[in-house]
Amino acid sequence: MNALTAVKANTDDLAQRHTGFILAPSAQSPRLLALTFTADTTRQFLHQVAQWPVQALEYKSFLRFKIGKILDDLCGNQLQPLLIKTLLNRAQGALLISAEGIDDVAQAEEMVKLATAVAHLIGRSNYDAMSGQYYARFVVKNVDNSDSYLRQPHRVMELHNDGTYVEEVTDYVLMMKIDEQNMEGGNSLLLHLDDWEHLESFFTHPLARRVMRWAAPPSKNVSHDVWHPVFDVDQQGRPVMRYIDQFVQPKDFEEGVWLSELSDALETSQNILSVPVPVGKFLLINNLFWLHGRDRFTPHPDLRRELMRQRGYFAYAASHYQTHQ
């Protein structure tokens, strides 16, 4: 079910003259669009939201939607419909977003505001138990002793979906680069489910829809297990996935062997995209049919990367998708 060659950029959206931002195909795939806010839009947005520190967004959740409206208004109210259309479009479902003039760790608060505004034009970001907020910021360094692969720099973090060990609906994932020092490697890895060469054989396997147990390590601050299958379907009957190799707990030999084979088949796909994400940029993907991971870094004693993530549910046209709940 490799559909990559059949994918064409949405010429209507790409050819349209947009207010406040530029839209273009990414260098990696026509499925991934690159959206850049102009310098003037960036300047006006930051000026209008300067009265609210990030703490205000944490304490008053409605402000997250207010700053989203400010950004959409600056874009002639063209931004929100385009974001929703792109993320719900099975042929795309992914954006690499940046803003001219936001590219330095000293602007970390501004980065959080921008990402929050974008996310709350499509839905709402869920509570993140790891941080205790609607977003999480975390650092990758040269040495790591944590209990998951999230911060381990010298190995590939395998392809996965987010939201596998929580009960909240996780339709989208946003991943932003806040800082990077002494870095080489570590590109984001993406795989669209329809481009995976082995989708048909795994999706039609008897274990594909079997309910399995998912459990997170202590650092995730989630105390109970959840139960769901690896695969499901959307309302059009197309495969969607909810999978991460670290947290699935096979109950027997049959499940363990199948999950191991599934992991190997994902990691050896020839259609994995390697996407550099510079400081200030962020990826926004549909979590149901995109998997994401991270390539390894080259060791350096002063290696440092800071990331910010948000993940949540679509508030528009959500009935188009099953959510495994």
From Swiss-Prot:
Metal-binding among the record's keywords?
A: yes
Instruction: State how the cofactor is bound.
Output: Binds 1 Fe(2+) ion per subunit.
Q: State the InterPro entries in the record.
A: GlaH (IPR015038), TauD-like_sf (IPR042098)
Tell me the cofactors it needs. Fe(2+)
Alphabetical list of CDD domains matching this protein? CAS_like
Pfam families membership: CsiD (PF08943)
- Covalent S-S links between cysteines: none
Metabolic or biological pathway, per its Swiss-Prot or TrEMBL entry: Amino-acid degradation
Assembly behavior: Homotetramer.
Family recorded in the similarity comment:
Belongs to the glutarate hydroxylase family.
Q: What is this protein called?
A: Glutarate 2-hydroxylase
Q: Its gene?
A: glaH
